[in-house]
Amino acid sequence: MKVALVVLALFGVSLAASIDNIEIPPSKNIYVEPINQPEVDPSLEIVNGQEVVPHSIPYQIFLVASAGETSWTCGGSLITKRYVLTAAHCIQGAKSVHVTLGAHNLAKHEASKVTVNGRSWVIHEKYDSTNIDNDIGVIQLERNLTLTRSIQLARLPSLRDVGINLEGRTATVSGWGLTNGIFQTTTDVLRANNTIISNKECNDVFKIVQPTEVCLSIAGGRSACSGDSGGPLVIDNVQHGIVSYGSSYCRSTPSVFTRVSSYLNWLQTHSEWRAQ
């Protein structure tokens, strides 16, 4: 199984957007080569996301991380007034992290938009970049945030949700990710709705899917794509997943998410969030 950690700038892709006139760095994504390569050109496959009503996903965050002269972007969610949930691969090796909240269009000035520095961040101690296991991390912000209509907390699973069967349920993934495999980005928050599939079906594609992960169907061509890494997967207003990996054939293979309910104890140890 071939795994590639990709920063889109390596392909010469320019993300023509900015946050308050500051150029947005490329996104950081994990691509896993499917066992059987789809018979489509990923550059032609547009992911059928829809623009959300502005600020209707108020826990959605946009992060920019840096290490030396290299910067990259990811998504995430606000889980307490001071902690952000994201994927481990989004903050691994970062020397600085900046989190933007209350945003809808990254390229426009919005009075609701707030950018806060990360004070510290931690990834799961058993994160495996080879098999993409335990792809979860948290960021402590430098200050507590004031909640507003545009900045709210994500609702995470309860202890009763541990081990529940999610197969067949409709889930929503959201973010500022690319609208196709490589070339087109968006400055507005998009969402895509689809159905959770079994890990067995997902493993027919990737062979590395674990019980601590959950997969989203690609029926109708709706899927998470490059740039959505770290963002939320929500079922009935509860965040059950974190965008982890997929293939560059966004519209032709499932997306894989870290299953949040598998890490409730870890989150309680490494953040202020408490399970109900």
From Swiss-Prot:
GO biological process: one example: proteolysis
Disulfide feature: 74-90, 202-215, 225-250
Matching InterPro entries: Peptidase_S1_PA, Peptidase_S1_PA_chymotrypsin, Peptidase_S1A, Trypsin_dom, TRYPSIN_HIS, TRYPSIN_SER
Entry-linked SMART domains: Tryp_SPc
Compartmental location: Secreted, Extracellular space
Enzyme nomenclature, EC number: 3.4.21.1
Tissue specificity statement from the Swiss-Prot or TrEMBL entry: Expressed in larval carcasses and gut, and adult gut.
Gene3D superfamilies reported in the protein's UniProt record: Trypsin-like serine proteases (2.40.10.10)
Signal peptide limits: 1-16
Keyword list, A-Z: Collagen degradation, Digestion, Disulfide bond, Glycoprotein, Hydrolase, Protease, Secreted, Serine protease, Signal, Zymogen
Catalytic activity: Preferential cleavage: Tyr-|-Xaa, Trp-|-Xaa, Phe-|-Xaa, Leu-|-Xaa
Active site: 89 (charge relay system), 135 (charge relay system), 229 (charge relay system)
Residues the record marks as carrying a glycan: 144, 193
Pfam families reported in the protein's UniProt record: Trypsin
Domain of life: Eukaryota
Propeptide residue range(s): 17-45
UniProt domain Peptidase S1: residue ranges: 46-272
Gene Ontology cellular component terms for the protein in this record: extracellular region
Main EC class the enzyme belongs to: hydrolase
A GO molecular function held by the record: serine-type endopeptidase activity
Function per UniProt: Serine protease with chymotryptic and collagenolytic activities.
PANTHER family: GRANZYME B (PTHR24271:SF81), KALLIKREIN-RELATED (PTHR24271)
Family per record: Belongs to the peptidase S1 family.
Listed name of the protein: Chymotrypsin
